[in-house]
Each structure stands twice: as structure tokens, then as C-alpha cells.
Amino acid sequence: MINKNDIVADVVTDYPKAADIFRSVGIDFCCGGQVSIEAASLEKKNVDLNELLQRLNEVEQTNTPGSLNPKFLNVSSLIQYIQSAYHEPLREEFKNLTPYVTKLSKVHGPNHPYLVELKETYDTFKNGMLEHMQKEDDVDFPKLIKYEQGEVVDDINTVIDDLVSDHIATGQLLVKMSELTSSYEPPIEACGTWRLVYQRLKALEVLTHEHVHLENHVLFKKVS
């Protein structure tokens, strides 16, 4: 049974669908997930701890036996999973979404300056993530695999610390985009492109939170 003293990130690791519940009440299970459920709930207004625990335990009870839980994968298999489930889809989404973000800023930015700032923040986020993922694929992940295989990797802790620092910076950019868009709620007058951009940015946020959680709280723990 999940209780108030359980660590938020650990709950999501054990029961991935719990991420949806934490997300719905604004609790960070990603870079800020190393706190108890009770402590996290106290930081949020209008979060009833007992109700939250009830919802989480419903997820625990309905957890499907035999369904893939990445925490049971070894390092090399987990890396392959991360690359196929997150790196490849993120690259594709950046390629497809960027023209819409640019169009939104160009067409509506003159009357809504925050959309210009949104594009600038998105570009920083996108470029940072693309560089980060490429470095992981080319340099960092091979080091983690070597470490798993018993080879000496002198800078393994530095590798992990640097990646976590990148993730924190990524999280800050996601917060800024959410704030600029009022949690991705388009105004009444928003056109189709506007609504499309907000919808897909929100989905991008969800995907990135899951991605970072899996690396910070599952992958890196296997090699630290």
C-alpha cells in the first residue's frame, strides 16, 4: 500500500501511471521528486492528502501484472527503451512542431508579446534537448553501458551529475513555457494553430517529464 511517507519519484518508478495523478495536482515527480508524498502535498494548495493517497492506491491495485515496467530492464535494454520511446519521438516532434510555433509567434506575436517569448523559450528548450540527447546517445550512454559491463569508467559520477544538471535546466524551461501559456490554456479568441501549439506543447511537457524521470530515478540509480 502506498503511504504518505513514500517518495514521489519511487512511486512513479513502481507504478508509472501514478505520474498522471501527480501531474493532475501539480506535484513534480521528475527533478523535484525526491520528497515524500506528504511533503509534496503540503507545498500545493487545494491538495487533500487522503484523497491523493486513495487515488494512488487505486492505481496500485489496478497495476497490470506482466506489463512492461522499465525499472526491471538492465542498463543497456533501458537505454534502448529510452531512445526508442523518447529520443526518437522527441526529435520527430520538434521537427514537426517548430513551424507552427514560429507561425504563431509571427502572426500573433505583435499583439501578444508573450507568444514571442514563448517561441524564444521553446527554441532554447528544443536546441538544448537536441544537443543533450545527441550527447547522451554518442557519449554518455555508451559509458553507462561500459560501466554495466564491468569496465572502469573514472568519470561516471561526473557524467551523471552533468546530465542531472541539464535535466534541471530543462525543467525550468518547461515551467516557464507553462507559465507563459497559463498552463497551456488558449484564450477564447485563439485560432486553430494557436490551440494546436498549446495542445502539442502540453503533450511535449508530459513526454519530457516521463523521459527525465526515467533517467534520473531509474537509469542513473542502476549505475550509481
Curated annotation (Swiss-Prot):
Localization per record: Cytoplasm
Transmembrane segments: none
Pfam families reported in the protein's UniProt record: Hemerythrin, ScdA_N
Entry's Gene Ontology cellular component terms: cytoplasm
GO biological process: protein repair; response to nitrosative stress; response to oxidative stress
GO molecular function: metal ion binding
UniProt keyword annotations, A-Z: Cytoplasm, Iron, Metal-binding, Stress response
Top-level taxonomic group: Bacteria
Subunit description: Homodimer.
Biological role: Di-iron-containing protein involved in the repair of iron-sulfur clusters damaged by oxidative and nitrosative stress conditions.
HAMAP family: RIC_ScdA (MF_01156)
Family label: Belongs to the RIC family. ScdA subfamily.
Name under which the protein is recorded: Iron-sulfur cluster repair protein ScdA
Gene: scdA
